[in-house]
Amino acid sequence: MIAVPEIRIMDTTLRDGMHAMAHQFTPEQMAQVAAALDEAGVDVIEVTHGDGLAGSSFQYGFAAATDEEYLEAVAPVLKKAKLAALILPGIGTCRDMRMAVQAGVKVFRIATHVTEADISEEHMGLAKEMGAEVVGFLMMSHTVGKEKIAEQAKLMESYGADVVYMVDSAGAMIPPEVTEKIGYLKEVLNIPVGFHAHNNLGLAVGNTLAAVAAGATAVDGTLRGLGAGAGNTSTEVLVAALKKAGYQVGVDLYKIMDAATVLEPMMRRPQVIDNASIILGYAGVYSSFLLHTYRAAERFGLDPRDILMELGRRKVVGGQEDYIVDVAYEMSRNKSRAV
């Protein structure tokens, strides 16, 4: 009999979900949600600004509290789950990582663009030095082929990553692509493979199931799918689907549904797949760009879909949110000249 692998659930409601909240969760709200996630048996709970440690800024949006305040609010309520923090080299620093460890972080998820794994070496080295688990996060993985993803994942493995995630930042992938790329990573890596999905094409749960079938053993979700654009993989739906498919999941289905109920009154809007979200997935644009694009479209009198398609053509990457205004301004001027 073939052993069914146990799937590790990492919930990022309190980090990736921050994008849909304009980064305005309070520390008290985070503690409430984290306690419910912990009670449900979630393995890892990620907490920071949506753009990771030190992301609170004019460029990315100011959070309601500091990373330290958020982490210190959540750490005491966790009885079983590990506390995680995201860091993007170039935004967060080694000093921020030291603060996070003092605040109770046990897992660092270190994210780079899929072609820039080399900039994670210092941060991964420090995380290992401090005794933390290291998760490599290769963002915008839809933009390159499986060989390039594998090359970059091997770099992260060499830096000490304990697991490497393929990240569909734009919700642009379809199941056959996920199957091919995850399967290839599984072949070439000597460490576990993970997958993080977005729901812009309505495929987050389906893509995650495809990833697991291809060998991924660590997967992400957010309660109610909370996140930028059409959101993320819904943790509670994913748990139900994985259990129905026969995988071992250490999360209690009823309790994770209860956790989603705790979150729901805090949400600013339901997670729906609207037209702009579809364009995000179709154009392959990073999901956190959506709210910034709406603002730029209103400011310059443009259709946000046109801005998103242009950003996709220019292959923008995470961290270039300030570029949206430049693109919108240029498009507005070109539109004026054409009149």
UniProtKB/Swiss-Prot annotation:
- Which annotated residues bind substrate? R15, D16, S169, H196, Y286
Task: Quote the Gene3D superfamilies the UniProt record gives.
Answer: 1.10.8.60, Aldolase class I
Active-site positions on this chain: H19 (proton acceptor)
Q: Which residues form the signal peptide?
A: none
Positions contributing to Mn(2+) binding? D16, H196, H198
Looking up InterPro entries in the UniProt record yields: 2-IPM_HCS-like, 4OH_2_O-val_aldolase, Aldolase_TIM, DmpG_comm, DRE_TIM_HOA, PYR_CT
Task: Fetch the SUPFAM superfamilies from UniProt.
Answer: Aldolase (SSF51569), post-HMGL domain-like (SSF89000)
Reaction(s) catalysed by this chain, per the record, are:
(S)-4-hydroxy-2-oxopentanoate = acetaldehyde + pyruvate
Query: What HAMAP family has UniProt attached to this entry?
Result: HOA (MF_01656)
Q: Which PANTHER family match?
A: 2-ISOPROPYLMALATE SYNTHASE 1, CHLOROPLASTIC-RELATED, HOMOCITRATE SYNTHASE-RELATED
From the Swiss-Prot or TrEMBL record, give the protein name. Answer: 4-hydroxy-2-oxovalerate aldolase
Give the organism the record lists.
Pelotomaculum thermopropionicum (strain DSM 13744 / JCM 10971 / SI)
